[in-house]
């Protein structure tokens, strides 16, 4: 992603590791993920299906089959007050959500606020991301959280 100095965006990434309800596990291959704002933020991950410790230990994914992130990024540095507003809005959602124990919000630098979540399936993770998206739109941009029509499919 490349952002102009005045740009702001909310984006997300959701990854399902296999299809658990179809008994099609992620048990072969490697998944590599790369999210970047050059010079500002770099997320890079590599998940090997044979890495049982990562996928199943309590210090890793603890058997969860979905990982997801939502991020608020800006082309110019956010003020501390705005970063705190974004974190507070996200944490208010997380604290009341069923996935609160496997989710968290952080601010790795003054251009990025990130929420990450692990879930047993995609749907609960996406539900959480939608709630954070709505909270951020309202708190950061004073825009009503009108969901895109495609979300109703």
Q: For each predicted feature, which ranges?
A:
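Intrinsically disordered, low-complexity linker/loop segments enriched in Gly/Pro
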Residues: 1-4
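A structural signal for small-residue-enriched, beta-sheet-centric alpha/beta enzyme cores
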Residues: 13-153
């Amino acid at each position: 992603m490349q952002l102009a100095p005045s740009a702001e965006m909310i984006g997300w990434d959701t990854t399902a590791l296999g299809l658990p309800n179809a008994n099609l596990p992620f048990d072969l291959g490697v998944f590599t993920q790369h999210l970047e704002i050059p010079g500002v933020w770099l997320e890079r991950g590599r998940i090997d299906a044979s890495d049982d410790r990562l996928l199943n230990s309590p210090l890793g994914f603890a058997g969860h089959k979905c990982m997801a992130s939502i991020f608020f990024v800006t082309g110019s540095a956010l003020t501390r007050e705005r970063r705190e507003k974004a974190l507070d809005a996200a944490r208010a959602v997380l604290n009341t959500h069923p996935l609160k124990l496997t989710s968290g919000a952080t601010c790795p630098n003054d251009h990025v606020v990130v929420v990450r979540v692990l879930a047993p399936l995609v749907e609960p993770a996406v539900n959480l991301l939608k709630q954070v998206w709505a909270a951020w739109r309202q708190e950061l941009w004073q825009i009503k959280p009108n969901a895109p029509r495609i979300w109703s499919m």
